[in-house]
Amino acid sequence: MAGLVAVVLVLSGCSGIGNPEQTRACRALADQVPGIAGVTRATFTDAMVGGLPRCSGDVVVTQGLSTTERGRVVGAVYDVIRTRAVKEVDFSTSFALGGGTLTVASGFPTSEQATRVMEIADASHADPVEIAYARGSLLATLHAPLSSTVPAASLREGVALLRTQPPAGFVELDWYLGQDVIVAPTLGVDDASRLDLLASWFPKNPAVTSYTLRIQAGVQTWTLVTSQEVPDVVRGFGAAARAGTTVKVSASLPGKPPYLTLP
């Protein structure tokens, strides 16, 4: 979120769809958040979302606040209800940050936690960003650009972001990089180092013109696009990528179905 300039959070009057404690908490947000320093408008709505009662919020925050000040606003919003007997998954808030957006889909991030995530977003120019309650902690999802479409350069740039460790209170950072060229969580040191080394494979094999990479549950799934059918080159990539990890590879010509798939 280059230059995260403003924050918008959404809230409106609560109609009592959820349990009584949730409804009271939603009303407290609607009543108290407009008075928080740095908030220019706030509405919360108690409504059914995905078949479940949720308190959804929108808050507009003063333009020109620093990252720390914006983090304080986010934390102060959840301070209103943090100690109430309500579930973190029953509340969601959308923040408009000038040129970017932050959604707290669930969870009650503190000022410090919100600030740390926005600092990472600033540094990576990530937009949008989502914070959610996950596995008893928080998880942040960041969509960030890659400055290069050259395979070796984009992979190295992506790996640099995947090395970013989650702030305190977050179990994981999930990244969607370069319009989903790379989709992966935070990597450990060994996995990141292996991918860095793999980047040097691409300049030696120019028939591979682009790739996508998905990493989930420790499995790397690579989709290669080649300028011509080069099965031996693809097999060589699979062997190089497979060192120390589980890998799936497929290769295709532009706009065509795969001509080779490696389990």
Model-found features: residue ranges?
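Extracytoplasmic/luminal low-complexity segments enriched in Pro/Gly and acidic/polar residues
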Residues: 186-263
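Bacterial signal peptide processing site
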Residues: 15-19
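N-terminal export and membrane-targeting signals
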Residues: 1-7
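N-terminal Sec/ER secretory leader and immediately downstream segment
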Residues: 25-101
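C-terminal motif of bacterial Sec signal peptides marking the signal peptidase cleavage site
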Residues: 9-13
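Long, acidic/polar, low-complexity amphipathic helices and coiled-coil-like
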Residues: 54-56, 71, 82-175
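Short amphipathic alpha-helices in soluble, non-transmembrane regions
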Residues: 29-32, 69-81, 121, 154-165, ...
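Short edge beta-strands and adjacent turn/loop segments
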Residues: 37-59, 129-139, 174, 207-222
